[in-house]
Curated annotation (Swiss-Prot):
It comes from Escherichia coli (strain K12). This is Protein YrfJ. Induction: Identified when cells are grown in rich medium (at protein level). The lineage of its organism: Bacteria, Pseudomonadati, Pseudomonadota, Gammaproteobacteria, Enterobacterales. Overlaps downstream argD. It comes from the Bacteria.
Length: 17
């Protein structure tokens, strides 16, 4: 459950960069 949030945050960070 917590992994989903981490994965989404990682994706958002990669997309921002």
């Amino acid at each position: 459950m917590r992994w989903q949030l981490n994965k989404q945050q990682l994706h958002a960070r990669l997309s921002m960069k």
